[in-house]
Amino acid sequence: MRGIIYCDKLETGLAEFKKIIEDYANIGITCDKPVANANQARVTFNNGDEWIVVRATEGSARGHACNVAYIDRMIPDDFVETIIMPTIKAFPYQAYRYYNWGTW
């Protein structure tokens, strides 16, 4: 399973990333050391799942594919519809959720 956390600002994406790592740890699934740079972060878990954090920019967000997407609510709706939604390969399910609701 591959998951992507799309974020408007890397800090908000990394906060959600840490929550996911904690959730996996709580059910006994460990991970390799997360790797991060200026535009994205990545972690692979011992069950084979992979999660990455990607900034929602034209250059960074294109070309990815995932089974599950977590989408920062601060990302404009037109960007979500045209760039992010086509990357989700979990049909017929809608395998996405929004996060970062509290900053509106």
Q: What are these regions, as identified by a protein language model?
A:
Residues 1-104:
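Short, flexible loop motifs at catalytic/binding sites
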